[in-house]
Structure formats: structure tokens, C-alpha cells
Amino acid sequence: MTMSPCPLLLVFVLGLVVIPPTLAQNERYEKFLRQHYDAKPNGRDDRYCESMMKERKLTSPCKDVNTFIHGTKKNIRAICGKKGSPYGENFRISNSPFQITTCTHSGASPRPPCGYRAFKDFRYIVIACEDGWPVHFDESFISP
């Protein structure tokens, strides 16, 4: 008895439809981590910002503002669940404050070398989540 290629083709096509969102989501989460996660910061001063922005490839062109969250991946991800609350449309706010460093571009030109000023804070953070994973940090939120 020979098996028709149709069931195998169907499984393959369904796999293509189901897998890409997972890959795209993983890429967005990895980008979020690259841009905004630093578990153990060293210094948290202007040199820290200049070094981290360059290391994370956020200087071509010079990014105006970027915030690094200093915590565990587990605690940041938990904001997408029970450790966060709905905030506006499609965002979640952390139930607890996080240590953060915000790097603000201080140069006149958007071209490297990029100069940055560091601002250290301990505040609530707002992120967007997809299927329980952080994918975007809201730079515009400043906690009271």
C-alpha cells in the first residue's frame, strides 16, 4: 500500500504557517533583550551608555534615547503575566519598580561617534508583550 503525498504536503504547509509567528516572536524578544536588557551594569555613567550603545549596535545612526533594564529576564518577562497590569492599549506596566539606566544622545550629529548622557532611576516600566514575551519598551513612559 502506498501513501499519497497529500497528507505529508498538508503537514509541511501547516508547519510553515504555524512556525513563522514563533520565529518572528522570538526575533522580536531577542531584539528587545539586545536593546533594553543588561542584568549587571558596570558603572551606569556616561561612559557606560556610550559603551553599551556601541556594543549593542544602536549607534548607526545614533539612537536618541534608549533605556537599559537591570533585572532578571524572568522578572521582566513576568510583567507580561501576573507581575504586570494592563496599561493603555497593548501595554503592561510592572507592578514593582526596576533599576534602569536611560541613555540620551548628547551630540548634535546623528552620525558616530555618538555621545550619551546617563540617567539612573528606579521606576515602574511599561512594555508591550506578544504571547507572554516582552517585545517593546515604551520610552515615553515616565513614572510619577
From Swiss-Prot:
Stretches that traverse the bilayer: none
GO terms under biological process: angiogenesis; antibacterial humoral response; defense response to bacterium; positive regulation of cell population proliferation; response to bacterium; RNA catabolic process
Superkingdom per UniProt: Eukaryota
UniProt keyword list: Angiogenesis, Antibiotic, Antimicrobial, Cytoplasmic vesicle, Disulfide bond, Endonuclease, Hydrolase, Nuclease, Nucleus, Secreted, Signal
GO cellular component, one term: nucleolus
Cell compartments where the protein resides: Secreted; Cytoplasmic vesicle, Secretory vesicle lumen; Nucleus, Nucleolus
Active site (record annotation): H36, H136
InterPro entries associated with the record: RNaseA (IPR001427), RNaseA-like_dom_sf (IPR036816), RNaseA_AS (IPR023411), RNaseA_domain (IPR023412)
Biological role stated in the UniProt entry: Has bactericidal activity against E.faecalis and L.monocytogenes, but not against L.innocua and E.coli. Promotes angiogenesis (in vitro). Has low ribonuclease activity (in vitro). Promotes proliferation of melanoma cells, but not of endothelial cells or fibroblasts (in vitro).
Listed name of the protein: Angiogenin-4
